[in-house]
């Protein structure tokens, strides 16, 4: 799984380049409003995906329990393995959902109180990290986040120019990590709430599914 804050390789698609060229003429506030709207849309998509994963996990969990009751250990282990894989994807999806929720909230606060330049840089870093993590699970969300990231990066650049200074690279990195850490904590809590402990499962796989987070 890609690590956060790696450079996004690959050329921006034509639609992204055209969209960004148009957006560069829009006001900073308008671009911020669009970024918030698009982030919330992707957050909702991830919430829907997480709900479907939870439902699928419940079905596999119930089959695992029934197989264990009937002493069909091989089948119980098979269903437990399937649950472990679902939970691994579900946790990443929840982490990404929580990170986008936190990012959108930060942008809304910045828009409300005018602290736009200092907040867009860490949000852009968060979006880049989330994109790297989610692309392998839900590619269409990853592609959309790549475009949102381009919009945010251009806005960060323009905001820095308008203020005649940079946006604080060290500070923005610390704030981005804070957002991701909060997302990990929230996702862990959601996992404990909605995914019951497996009655039987290969321990290494189950443990790996619960320990992964943003790196």
Description of each model-found segment:
Residues 1-48, 117-215:
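Long C-terminal interaction segments enriched in charged/acidic composition
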């Amino acid at each position: 799984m890609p690590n956060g804050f790696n450079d996004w390789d690959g050329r921006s698609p034509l639609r992204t380049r055209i969209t960004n060229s148009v957006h560069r003429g829009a006001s900073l506030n308008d671009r911020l409003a669009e970024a918030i709207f698009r982030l919330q849309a992707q957050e909702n998509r991830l919430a829907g995906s997480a709900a479907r994963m939870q439902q699928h996990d419940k079905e596999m969990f119930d089959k695992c329990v029934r197989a264990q009751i009937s002493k069909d250990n091989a089948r119980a282990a098979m269903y437990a393995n399937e649950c472990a894989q679902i939970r691994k994807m579900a946790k990443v999806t929840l982490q990404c959902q929580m990170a986008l929720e936190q990012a959108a909230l930060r942008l809304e606060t910045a828009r409300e109180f005018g602290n736009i330049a200092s907040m867009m840089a860490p949000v852009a870093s968060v979006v880049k990290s989330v994109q790297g993590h989610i692309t392998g699970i839900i590619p269409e969300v990853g592609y959309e986040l790549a475009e949102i990231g381009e919009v945010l990066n251009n806005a960060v650049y323009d905001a820095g120019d308008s203020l005649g200074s940079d946006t604080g690279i060290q500070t923005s990195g610390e704030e981005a990590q804070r957002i991701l850490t909060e997302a990990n904590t929230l996702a862990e809590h959601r996992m404990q709430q909605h995914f019951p402990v497996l009655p039987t499962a290969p321990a290494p796989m189950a443990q790996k599914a619960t320990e992964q987070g943003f790196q």
